[in-house]
Amino acid sequence: MREIVHLQTGQCGNQIGAAFWQTISGEHGLDSNGVYNGTSELQLERMSVYFNERSGNKYVPRAVLVDLEPGTMDAVRAGPFGQLFRPDNFVFGQSGAGNNWAKGHYTEGAELVDQVLDVVRREAEGCDCLQGFQITHSLGGGTGAGMGTLLISKIREEFPDRMMATFSVVPSPKVSDTVVEPYNATLSVHQLVENSDETFCIDNEALYDICMRTLKLSNPSYGDLNYLVSAVMSGVTTCLRFPGQLNSDLRKLAVNMVPFPRLHFFMVGFAPLTSRGAHSFRAVSVPELTQQMFDPKNMMAASDFRNGRYLTCSAIFRGRVAMKEVEDQMRNVQNKNSSYFVEWIPNNIQTALCAIPPRGLTMSSTFIGNSTSIQELFKRVGEQFTAMFRRKAFLHWYTGEGMDEMEFTEAESNMNDLVSEYQQYQDAGIDEEEEEYEEELPEGEE
């Protein structure tokens, strides 16, 4: 079976990760100790993608939990699903990274990284045919951002031909918990552009908006936000966990979604959105799902796709859905919103179906879009970065850990390049492409 090893780093990564494991354990009929008491054969069929089978019908997640301070880990261990994880897979330091990317990437994190890699290696060896890794982390902090990206590059070195998917929580414009977020995020994006194969961008502010606007929660907790993220993660990984007809692994997803290797930052959405307690009180139909799924208010990254164009996108429908109806709806969406799709990639929407809906719903859909409007997100971080970096504010925290200003300049220009690449493909039309191509031919020296 095509296994995936899951890593969660830092406070944010561990909390999202814990919510994710809680969600998929439920979908696979496992209780909080990992004992199977489900009802359907389908739950067992591809269980091994995320779980190792132990004796006595008990399943253990292929998860590695990493943090530079023990606090969050203890919380996970004491939480409802704390007994699920293998105790040796908790790897933590004592000092904390203090929201400092350099500590996570170069000093504190670098000391812990070998220990983590040992655990990763052990998990990888227990796999039949490892398909890749997924990592949950935030880009604004120290451990998730600094050490998370360090782990990604180390794993890249050791498993160069395996997929690397990241679920990255990007700093949001209004909700910020540390002043150095723009630094940490820019340095992380600089790493992700080079080392990750697919990055699902999640944004706290967009999640707050969804909670307040759509779910009508007056003051959402992180628990509510993580619940939304875990719904999307569960949706994105559906095809990997249940027998489906399309898009059954990370590599296929990447091949269909990434037209140019650097442009692998996706926005995600989920429908139907229901708050944690109130599972849908009405029947959902495919047209409704499709409409809600393509609604800008449903995107979990704070960038509006109406300001850009989709290079590619993928929709995953779950539940008892008629294939024909889905195809009609998707064609419909593409015809109505044709201006939001680039015309030089024909058929750039693809759909996947899975017969098993999430718990408590009859059907649901998950949306993954590679839109050029994601550049808004990088632009925003870039502006904040520049404002601080011009004055060299807070820089001593980083140089004190042995970093060089040069690295900041590099990261900044790499991110600016990324933004202009997105812009270039947003503006490109069919006819221009051909003209450019003809102009470039005579030189042929590259």
From Swiss-Prot:
Keywords assigned: Antibiotic resistance, Cytoplasm, Cytoskeleton, GTP-binding, Magnesium, Metal-binding, Microtubule, Nucleotide-binding
MF terms in GO: GTP binding; GTPase activity; metal ion binding; structural constituent of cytoskeleton
Compositionally biased intervals (Acidic residues): 429-446
Gene3D superfamilies associated with the record: Helix hairpin bin, Tubulin/FtsZ, C-terminal domain, Tubulin/FtsZ, GTPase domain
Primary subcellular site in the record, as a coarse category: cytoplasm
Residues binding GTP, per UniProt: Q11, E69, S138, G142, T143, G144, N204, N226
Record region (Disordered): 421-446
Keyword GTP-binding: yes
Cofactor field: Mg(2+)
Binding site for Mg(2+): E69
Role noted for this protein: Tubulin is the major constituent of microtubules, a cylinder consisting of laterally associated linear protofilaments composed of alpha- and beta-tubulin heterodimers. Microtubules grow by the addition of GTP-tubulin dimers to the microtubule end, where a stabilizing cap forms. Below the cap, tubulin dimers are in GDP-bound state, owing to GTPase activity of alpha-tubulin.
Family statement: Belongs to the tubulin family.
The protein's name in its UniProt record: Tubulin beta chain
Origin organism lineage: Eukaryota, Fungi, Dikarya, Ascomycota, Pezizomycotina
